[in-house]
């Protein structure tokens, strides 16, 4: 199902489109966004062995599997599901107050890094929150958050499944 000529051609075309200005060398195709996110989480957790927590943003949507429902900040999606994934939520970009929202995000991020040193397997970022109200974070805001996480050794994972194509250009 996942390994045929069409999928290979698609993956090669996607990498070619993504490569300018990036370090992308691999592509994984998935039949759904939730399964893509599950695999992304698995890769991050394997990369950061022993880091049981992850960082995500308020009002994010990850998918409808058991794990992605726990990460997503959609309360109804977690009803009746035992919580086994440790998620620390950060405030997302606010268009009406970019600088203030960045300060609030960075303050809480620093608190989590202090409180749970070396315990975050990744930070999951939707550059354009779909379920959260179609809120598009500014590139500069994303850059500051991502750079701080990279400084702390935390992989930065962009979940661009639902909002793909809503940015001005590919992988902006």
Residue ranges and their predicted role:
Residues 1-8, 129:
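A glycine-/small-polar-enriched, mobile loop at the entrance of the PLP active site in fold-type I
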Residues 11-122:
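PLP-dependent aspartate aminotransferase-fold enzymes
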Residues 15, 142-150:
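Surface-exposed amphipathic alpha-helices with a cationic face
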Residues 45, 146, 167-168:
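Short, cationic motifs built from Arg/Lys/His that form the positively charged side of catalytic pockets
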Residues 120, 153-154:
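Loop/turn-to-beta-strand initiation segments
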Residues 126-139, 154-172:
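Conserved PLP phosphate-binding loop immediately N-terminal to the Schiff-base lysine helix
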């Amino acid at each position: 199902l996942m390994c045929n000529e069409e999928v290979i051609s698609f993956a090669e075309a996607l990498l070619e489109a993504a490569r300018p200005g990036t370090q992308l060398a691999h592509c994984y195709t998935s039949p759904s966004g939730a399964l893509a996110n599950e695999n992304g989480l698995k890769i991050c957790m394997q990369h950061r062995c022993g880091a049981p927590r992850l960082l995500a943003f308020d009002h994010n949507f990850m998918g409808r599997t058991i794990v992605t429902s726990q990460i997503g900040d959609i309360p109804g999606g977690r009803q009746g599901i035992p919580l086994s994934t440790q998620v620390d939520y950060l405030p997302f970009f606010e268009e009406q107050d970019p600088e203030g929202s960045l300060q609030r995000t960075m303050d809480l991020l620093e608190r989590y890094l202090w409180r749970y040193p070396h315990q975050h397997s990744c930070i999951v970022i939707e550059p354009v929150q779909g379920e959260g109200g179609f809120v598009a974070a500014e590139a500069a805001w994303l850059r500051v958050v991502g750079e701080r996480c990279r400084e702390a050794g935390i992989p930065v994972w962009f979940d661009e499944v639902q909002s793909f194509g809503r940015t001005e250009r590919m992988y902006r």
